[in-house]
Amino acid sequence: NAFLGMGDDCRLLLQTFDEYLAGFLKRVGKDRAYSSYDNYRKRRNRLASFLEYEYRVKDIAFKELKRDFIEKFVVYLSSVQGMRSGTIHSTIKKLKLMTYTAYKNGWIPADPFAGFYVRPEYSERRYLSASELQAVMDAELPNYRTGINRDAFVFCAFTGLSHADVVKLTHADIYTDDNGERWIIDRRQKTGTQFRVKLLPVAEMLYERYKDTYRTGEKVFPLKGTYKTLNMSLRHVARHAGLSFNPTIHCARH
């Protein structure tokens, strides 16, 4: 009963996480991206799996959380789930957000995980050189869908748009000024901050390639699938372009 938090004055960990997710979901499409929501949801599910694995419970009261809980959680993520340190670091940050919330709301007298830190060990991220980007642009691809994904990648490279921003980009977000130059005027999916980006020749060429599908509000790039499936498609692009590594859509921005 102590783990389950019996009593009206007990707040539960996953209960609080679920409330946070519900609030986050309401902001998706406004100042939050669905991909960020999905990231939090997956971390929540890892935590639920750990509670079942280690304690055989569906939830746990904040007042029952001690230092060894988070230490065991790190071991579980590494040994059972096979996560790397960067992903573990991200998962622990989400857990610590919940305990900090509990502390700030007065549900517990102190944050049990304050000062706990997992050092991420990221591998060096590769970026495309000018010649590699040109190879991607010139690659002969096997099908239309892979071509769309390649074009979206190149468009991001010449505009600095993120995956979330290019997915939601519509023809209505692109304006032509008095000089005949085209600009993207939109808001960042993740932060809600307005931005303006002038279309350089390559980006404008790609826009022209797809603008014949124009209808009010229609997306510029008819992308399907998730961030993960797009990156899987880019692996095929990399192979046809003769690249020595597999770029992700994030690489396009740098």
Positions of predicted regions on the chain:
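Short, surface-exposed polybasic/aromatic micro-patch for ligand or macromolecular engagement
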Residues: 1
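N-terminal DNA-binding recognition helix of tyrosine site-specific recombinases/integrases
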Residues: 35, 46-53, 60, 68-71, ...
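Short basic/aromatic active-site micro-motif
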Residues: 65-68, 90, 148-152, 224-228, ...
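Basic, Lys/Arg- and aromatic-enriched nucleic-acid-binding interface segment
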Residues: 85, 89-91, 108, 112-163, ...
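Conserved tyrosine-mediated DNA breakage-rejoining catalytic core shared by Y-recombinases
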Residues: 123-126, 132, 159, 168-208
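C-terminal catalytic core of Y-nucleophile DNA break-rejoin enzymes
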Residues: 189-208, 215-236, 248-250
